[in-house]
Swiss-Prot record:
Residue positions binding Mg(2+) 1: D190, E194
Domain KARI N-terminal Rossmann stretches: 1-181
Cofactor note: Binds 2 magnesium ions per subunit.
Stated name of the protein: Ketol-acid reductoisomerase (NADP(+))
Source organism per UniProt: Staphylococcus saprophyticus subsp. saprophyticus (strain ATCC 15305 / DSM 20229 / NCIMB 8711 / NCTC 7292 / S-41)
Length: 334
């Protein structure tokens, strides 16, 4: 069992007296910046001109272009989309790094796959909250927190680990617990979870179930309720108490069907396909494909997105959600 670090575990405040630059002021950026500021740390924001620039100023921060923020800071947290981090780092951050600066990430993609290669005299570590930015901020304000992972990749200063834990405590994560990992483990497991289960696996499972019912002559609206709408109810039960809690909470009919039909859907072949997905991630095949498509203006990405937008389940869902005012609809119109 891995060690979990809590507030009382972090006795040295290695972040005190250092200037922290948060690069990016999106979902994670605003949460990290505001939590650190509320805990008394010296925080500046580095972003390009735009709406986020104005928002950060309105929130009371000193806001600078990325290169100037990097030049001023001792600790630089990069909270930009994966696909633009490499260019921003090369053009605006790297020229302004000094020995014993700390370069920090919330996801290991660009370090692990070599897109960003920091100089050897710079600390490199990761602090990755396991939740979206709005939840990181809201739970902090309520006195609780979202758990996080941390990892150290380079430690020329000898204090990267202390800095990582101090940063995690600064954003509130040690209230809930912080687990140590590596850039390799965080990156590969995160990508696998997204592709095989949370996003890719779940969406294809739901779509296939919907299509099976509709093709068999059932009403699309009924199919939507059975395979998508009720998904949240089941996931919430697992989230709150694991699979045992879910099975305890459903009917005996549903539980029996779980046992006898689940293995018919998720067969050994499906697990073999999952292993192939993991292998692609580990070998860098997925990252190469993503990076090359980014360099090609995301031609494949945009094509795939457009194909999925037109699926019948989306149109049916938009109509049904209009019937349920208790759902805060977030339909994406194009």
């Amino acid at each position: 069992m891995t060690t979990v670090y809590y507030d009382q575990s972090v006795t040295k405040d290695a972040l005190q007296g250092k200037k922290v630059a948060i690069i990016g002021y999106g979902s994670q950026g605003h949460a990290h910046a505001q939590n650190l500021k509320d805990n008394g740390y010296d925080v500046i924001i580095g972003i390009r001109p735009g709406c986020s620039f104005d928002k950060a100023k309105d929130d009371g921060f000193e806001v600078y272009p990325v290169d100037e923020a990097a030049k001023q800071a001792d600790v630089i947290m990069v909270l930009l989309p994966d696909e633009i981090q490499g260019q921003v780092y090369k053009e605006e951050i790297e020229p302004n790094l000094e020995a014993n600066n700390a370069l920090v990430f919330a996801h290991g993609f660009n370090i692990h796959f070599g897109v960003i290669q920091p100089p050897e005299n710079v600390d490199v570590f990761l602090v990755a909250p396991k939740g979206p930015g709005h939840l990181v901020r809201r739970t902090f304000a309520e006195g609780s927190a979202v758990p996080a992972l941390f990892a150290v990749e380079q430690d020329p200063s000898g204090e990267a680990r202390d800095l990582a834990l101090s940063y995690a405590k600064g954003i509130g994560a040690t209230r809930a617990g912080v687990l140590e990992t590596s850039f390799k483990e965080e990156t590969e497991t995160d990508l696998f979870g997204e592709q095989a289960v949370l996003c890719g696996g779940t969406t294809k499972l739901v779509q296939s179930g919907f299509e099976t019912l509709v093709e068999a002559g059932y009403q699309p609206e009924i199919a939507y309720f059975e395979v998508l709408h009720e998904m949240k109810l089941i996931v919430d039960l697992m989230y709150e108490g694991g699979m045992e809690n879910m099975r305890y909470s459903i009917s005996n009919t549903a539980e029996f069907g779980d046992y006898v039909s689940g293995p018919r859907i998720i067969t050994p072949d499906v697990k073999d396909n999952m292993k192939a997905v993991l292998d692609d991630i580990q070998k860098g095949n997925f990252s190469d494909r993503f990076i090359k498509d980014n360099q090609n203006n995301f031609e494949e990405f945009h094509k795939l997105r457009e194909e999925q937008h037109g699926h019948q389940i989306e149109a049916v869902g938009r109509e049904l959600r209009d019937m349920m005012p208790f759902i805060k609809s977030k339909s994406i119109e194009k």
